Amino acid sequence: MLHKVSLGVGNIDKYRTIETRGLIDEIVSLGEELKGLRLCHINSTPFGGGVAELLVSYIPLLRSLGIKADWQIIRGDRRFFTITKGFHNALQGAPFDEIKKEGLKRVYQSNNLTNAGELDPNYDVFIVNDPQPAAL
């Protein structure tokens, strides 16, 4: 199984003191429609970067709405993460000449196949938040 980030349940009501337009009530109402949904966010690291900064508070808030949300982290060897760092930078406009290197696709696919084999099939929805596990 993939590593599951340990998080608790948040309290959406604490935001009522700063929100005055009824948005919390709307979020709670929309959450009723999703109550019980099994949702898994997947990314490559639990620390640093925008995804981790968002999910650390977002997952507990989803749970406070009754959504069975989890956050899991993929595994990969050093070469996989070097290659996918290049993908990440290329998506932001940097050149990525390594794409032509022999075996790059094989390393990427092999690591993602290993991770795919560790996915828990008991989720209704998977959200992939990084280019590293995009092939899942």
Tell where the protein language model's regions lie, with residue ranges.
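Catalytic cores of nucleotide-sugar-dependent glycosyltransferases that transfer UDP/GDP/TDP-activated
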Residues: 1-136
